[in-house]
Amino acid sequence: MNEGQVVQVIGPVVDVEFASDRLPDLYNAITIKTDKINITMEAMQHLGNNTVRCVALSSTDGLQRGMKAVDTGQPITVPVGRATLGRLFNVLGEPIDNQGPVETTERLPIHRPAPSFEEQQPSTEVLETGIKVVDLLAPYAKGGKIGLFGGAGVGKTVLIMELIRNIAYEHGGFSVFSGVGERTREGNDLYLEMKESGVLEKTALVFGQMNEPPGARLRVGLTGLTMAEYFRDAEGQDVLLFIDNIFRFVQAGSEVSALLGRMPSAVGYQPTLATEMGALQERITSTKKGSITSVQAIYVPADDLTDPAPATTFAHLDATTVLSRQIAELGIYPAVDPLDSTSRILDPRVLGEEHYQVARGVQQVLQRYKELQDIIAILGMDELSEEDKLIVARARKIQRFLSQPFHVAEAFTGQPGVYVPLKETIRGFKEILEGRHDNLPEQAFYMVGTIDEAVKKGQELM
């Protein structure tokens, strides 16, 4: 057993002295255990004089100089496999849901290399989500990374839960949710809502919330990722990985960097910002065995998209889903902005000509409606040309048809949720663009699944 001695404690940073020939490797887990204390730390720097600087992953209250610290000889390992589904973990992979120990012998280290060039599968397959606005206008690629933007109360959590539900029930896939530095109350709400809506048993949850020391918030993303990698590599699954919030990962890195005495770079962020982000993001990919598709909520500090944290994240994204308060105010949910959301695979070579043309057609009509709104506000609808009146009518139908009832919101809306297959989505919008449903009232298109439901609802209304 390789034992050292604590020589200095400054907040979450602890210096430990070892024998000269037995220095622990970087990233090794180092534990300090007494009757009252049980702390795991990670070796971060070799300082010289046989001293290792460590970052603690839990509170360092009660630590004293001279205490014994033990090098475990390996990085932090976390439980993986099906036993993790339906459970709630902390950064060390310890269950925190009072449901007893996890029934698994499989454990993996949280620091692992990204899949090599040969193992990667550059697939440009669409991941069908069953959510019309996403599948049509900003489709997700299997193994892609999606940024989810939205302020408070526009429906990020509900959208995340619906995605988890659809992947679980329609594709039989699993999800991993990593709560990084967000509010504990929100994590608790999510856990209880998932329990109620029945998606919990298909999901592993890992939390390192705002009250945790920066070391825990920096590593909790890797803990969730390691669990997701096991489902991809050992079980050949298409896994969904949610990270909420990727900005807090950067923020924790910046705190740790300052504590370790590194010179800050732009806007006070860590000099290793791009490296840390890359080490996490490069492990999220498609391999020949399976894929990890990741949806990352992105907080934009002071709405400044040029801030180094969001700017570094953008370099890794394949698609963005932007939730808009204006759309939520119209009562259209999911409140995805059809003109602001983007996708790298919105390309006829990937999606096929029909899907691409319909998507672009929908965007053109909505864009024209946006331009005409000022004229309508000042002069009224009557001043528009016949052609523009038709565009406005179709745009309003499209806008309403982009809404749909969610399974996970059934308890609140009283409406059964719908999963809309991609072909049905394309057919529906194509028919609206062609003017086949110009005679139906726009209310018929609100909160329905397929176009057939809209027609039926329209006939009942007329």
From Swiss-Prot:
Keyword Translocase applies: yes
Source taxon at top rank: Bacteria
CDD domains per the UniProt record, alphabetical: ATP-synt_F1_beta_C, ATP-synt_F1_beta_N, F1-ATPase_beta_CD
Entry-linked InterPro entries: AAA+_ATPase, ATP-synt_VA_C, ATP_synth_F1_bsu, ATPase_a/bsu_AS, ATPase_alpha/beta_chains, ATPase_F1/V1/A1_a/bsu_N, ATPase_F1/V1/A1_a/bsu_N_sf, ATPase_F1/V1/A1_a/bsu_nucl-bd
Protein's cellular compartments: Cell membrane
PROSITE patterns associated with the record: ATPASE_ALPHA_BETA (PS00152)
GO CC, one annotated term: proton-transporting ATP synthase complex
Pfam families xref list: ATP-synt_ab, ATP-synt_ab_N, ATP-synt_VA_C
Presence of keyword Cell membrane: yes
Catalyzed chemical reaction(s): ATP + H2O + 4 H(+)(in) = ADP + phosphate + 5 H(+)(out)
Binding, ATP: G150, G151, A152, G153, V154, G155, K156, T157
Membrane topology note: Peripheral membrane protein
Biological role stated in the UniProt entry: Produces ATP from ADP in the presence of a proton gradient across the membrane. The catalytic sites are hosted primarily by the beta subunits.
Family: Belongs to the ATPase alpha/beta chains family.
Subunit and partners: F-type ATPases have 2 components, CF(1) - the catalytic core - and CF(0) - the membrane proton channel. CF(1) has five subunits: alpha(3), beta(3), gamma(1), delta(1), epsilon(1). CF(0) has three main subunits: a(1), b(2) and c(9-12). The alpha and beta chains form an alternating ring which encloses part of the gamma chain. CF(1) is attached to CF(0) by a central stalk formed by the gamma and epsilon chains, while a peripheral stalk is formed by the delta and b chains.
Full protein name: ATP synthase subunit beta
Organism, as annotated: Moorella thermoacetica (strain ATCC 39073 / JCM 9320)
Lineage: Bacteria, Bacillati, Bacillota, Clostridia, Moorellales
